[in-house]
Amino acid sequence: DSKEWLDAGYLNKTVKGQWNDDWNKAMSSESKVFAFLFPAWGIDFTLKPNWDGAEGDWAVTNPPQEYNWGGSYIQAATGTDNPEHVKDIILAMTGNQDNLLKISKEYSDFTNTKSGMKDAATNADFASDFLGGQNPFEYFAPVAENIKIAPLSAYDQGCVELIQNAFSDYFQGKVDFDKAKANFETAIQERYPEITEIQWPE
């Protein structure tokens, strides 16, 4: 559990949340941070731009628990000048295995092709220079098999953001657990007034 890790000294207490300057600096060569729990896209999108050291200093390993942290989506805008091309573009970006494998190879990102990711795991061409020649798909592909996708709703992303914000104060020792829960409930009801009750697991 995250609080146990924090209390044991496994987490860097100077990093106050995600997507901020502290977090970005924790990925630099000056940092003493040992590891980050990232989704596949975190390597190229987050870690690589913040790293100023040598290639090969980072690697991928199995996580303590399989999880899914969203993905990338493609949508067509109402009023596009090219409505006749929308379907073909979306299919090319989401359902064409050759295109998906190009994305995976260039960005070390896990894409929407189960058989393609399985093949990438055993293909040396998918090794990453940034990861010192490691093929991250050797880890991604088998771990992905165990991810359970819960039903998603229009509220999921907002709830994840708000629970991270509310419990950041708890992890930093500013509030107790019950206060963090209460702060989350307040934040949810402010953002989504139509949600009238929050049920916590027993």
Please describe what each predicted stretch is.
Residues D1-P49, E55, E84, A180:
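Extracytoplasmic ligand-binding clamshell segments of periplasmic binding protein
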Residues F34-P39, A59-N62, I74-A76:
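Structural recognition of the beta-strand scaffold that forms the well-ordered cores
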Residues E4-G9, A26, P49, A54, ...:
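Structured segments of extracytoplasmic/periplasmic soluble domains
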Residues V15, W19, E106-Y107, A180, ...:
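Flexible domain-boundary/linker segments
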Residues E4-D7, E138-E202:
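Conserved C-terminal helix/tail region of periplasmic/extracytoplasmic solute-binding proteins
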Residues D1-S2, W23, W41, W58, ...:
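Tryptophan-centric aromatic hotspots in well-structured domains and transmembrane helices
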Residues D44-G53, P64-G70, Q75-N165, Q199-W200:
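C-terminal lobe and pocket-closing loops
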Residues W58-A59, E145:
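Proteostasis/folding factors centered on peptidyl-prolyl cis-trans isomerases
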